[in-house]
């Protein structure tokens, strides 16, 4: 984390003195940084812990969130992004103000802040902190009660995450997201390989055979009405939820508004959709 912070600082030094430099990375982000930042913004504790937990407890039907996300990123690249960049908007509320009026802009800001403050950020910090407590046994390490360790971990994670954005602006966030994303991608590939090897007593093939022939109902990706993600919801509520998330969610699309041009922005969005 220290190395990522240092590289991010070097990349953004002297570039956060203006509004566009701070909030839009000088409108100079390339496709690689846009894709990396979008993926890391999306891939937080609720995905790593929530979706894995859902697959373990039920089946693979929760992958529907990722399947419909790919469609949403295509819509973002070819329908929404050209309009955002054509108007040189800095935020989605600014776009809504131009499209409708100031009342709609203010209402959207209030709704976004309530959603981030009461739903998104608390769930991410809470789930991430529980994972850290389990991995490093923080209560025993610091000799403090579990509740205190949880609160301390939440504060530390929140402060570490805020440092990038507050002092480095959007470009620092994009750079750090991309660098962390490389490590996460490597680890994400290594974990199932190592897990299958351990399950197969050193053989990935044997491990894969065991998975394919044990509790096979968990490999079902077509969710029933009793699963967390019923199949029918892919064509009703879920597709609209993903269209909101990938096309109009401020903290996701902010990276695309900072693209150096439309082509780079579209490539970045489509690249993130490919990995989804």
Predicted segments with their positions:
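Membrane-helix boundary/linker segments in multi-pass transporters
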Residues: 6-29, 83-90, 94, 104, ...
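Helix-loop-helix module between adjacent transmembrane segments
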Residues: 5, 39, 61-165, 237-245
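Membrane-embedded alpha-helical core segments of multi-pass
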Residues: 1-4, 48, 72-79, 88-89, ...
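Membrane-interface "cap" regions at the ends of multi-pass membrane proteins
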Residues: 1-48, 165-168, 181, 187, ...
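Membrane-water interface regions at transmembrane-helix termini and the short interhelical loops
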Residues: 12, 56, 80-86, 130, ...
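Hydrophobic alpha-helical segments of secondary membrane carriers
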Residues: 36, 111-115, 176, 271-272
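Loop-to-helix junctions at membrane interfaces in multi-pass transport proteins
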Residues: 26-29, 33, 50-64, 97, ...
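Hydrophobic core positions of alpha-helical segments in small-molecule transporters
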Residues: 153-157, 175-179, 268-271
């Amino acid at each position: 984390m220290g190395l990522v912070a240092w590289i991010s600082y070097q990349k953004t030094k002297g570039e956060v003195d203006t509004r566009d430099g701070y909030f839009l990375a000088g409108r100079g982000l390339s496709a690689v940084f846009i894709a990396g930042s979008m993926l890391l913004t999306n891939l937080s504790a609720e995905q790593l812990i929530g979706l894995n937990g859902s697959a373990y407890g039920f089946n693979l039907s929760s992958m529907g969130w990722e399947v419909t996300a790919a469609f949403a990123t295509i819509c973002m690249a070819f329908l929404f992004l050209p309009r955002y960049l054509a108007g040189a908007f800095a935020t989605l509320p600014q776009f809504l103000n131009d499209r409708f009026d100031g009342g709609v802009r203010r209402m959207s800001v209030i709704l976004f802040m309530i959603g981030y403050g009461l739903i998104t950020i608390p769930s991410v910090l809470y789930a991430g902190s529980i994972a850290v407590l389990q991995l490093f046994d923080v209560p025993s390490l610091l000799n403090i009660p579990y509740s205190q360790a949880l609160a301390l971990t939440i504060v530390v994670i929140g402060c570490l995450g805020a440092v990038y954005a507050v002092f480095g602006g959007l470009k620092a966030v994009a750079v750090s997201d991309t660098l962390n994303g490389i490590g996460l991608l490597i680890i994400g590939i290594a974990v199932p390989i190592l897990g299958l090897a351990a399950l197969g007593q050193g053989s990935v093939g044997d491990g894969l055979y065991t998975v394919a022939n044990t509790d096979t109902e968990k490999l079902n990706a077509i969710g029933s009405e009793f699963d967390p993600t019923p199949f029918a919801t892919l064509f009703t509520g879920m597709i609209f939820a993903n269209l909101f998330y990938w096309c109009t969610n401020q903290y996701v699309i902010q990276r695309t508004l900072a693209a150096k041009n439309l082509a780079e922005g579209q490539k970045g969005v489509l690249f993130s959709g490919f990995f989804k």
